[in-house]
Amino acid sequence: LSDVVTEAKADGENYILNGYKSVVMNGPSANKIIISARTSNSQLDENGITLFIVDSDSNGLAKTNYKTVDGRRASDLTLENVSVSKDNIIGSLDSGFEILDSAIDKAILAISAEAVGAMEVLYKTTVEYTKTREQFGTSIGKFQVLQHRMVDMFMEYEQCKSLLYMATMKHEEGAPDAKKAISGLKYQVGKAGKFIGQQAVQLHGGMGVTD
């Protein structure tokens, strides 16, 4: 978070921003964009980062729009002498890191909850499909080797759900190890999501790759 190279230099009642911001989700349709810029100290210092609200049609702001792998839209931004009023600072000068740190923890929890919900749908849909798909005169859900794979899907999902509840409670309570719990959740959700998704595709056979 502290590796910020975009710079903001004071210019009277404004700041002049120069730099780059990548992967701005929903950037193509955004009217305003939050930019983190360094207003003091060195590149990797946690202090000296300030958040600015920037109009997307500001002079000197250029967008490169593209689709993401999940079908959403994103933008990469280039800022060249973009003038922003001091009134557009979020919080106070040089305090952006604390705001970002808190917001990202909440974002990880929210996205993880979405992912855990997707895992549940994948697992349950796969179980139901194997009850109706037949091979060799019986439903494939009765094949022990496939049952083992679905048990693994269930266990990965349940572990992630438990981690999600635990990390969320620690965050809300302000527990000293909340960040550790959130980091563990982020890792496990990514690992389990990939595993459950792959198993769902494979157990659906040809249906798993049919649009």
Question: Which role fits each region the language model picked out?
Answer:
Residues L1-A10:
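A gly/ser-rich beta-alpha-beta helix-loop segment of oxidoreductase catalytic cores
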Residues Y15, I33, T50, R73-T78:
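Short beta-strand micro-motifs in enzyme catalytic cores
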Residues M25, L44, K67-G71, I104-E114:
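Short alpha-helix boundary/capping segments
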Residues A10, K21, A37-T39, I53-S56, ...:
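Short, structured patches in soluble enzyme cores that scaffold and shape functional sites
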Residues A10-I16, D76, F97-D211:
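Alpha-helical interface subdomain recognition
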Residues D3, D55-G91:
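Flexible, small-/acidic-enriched active-site or ligand-binding loops
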Residues N18-A62:
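A short core secondary-structure module
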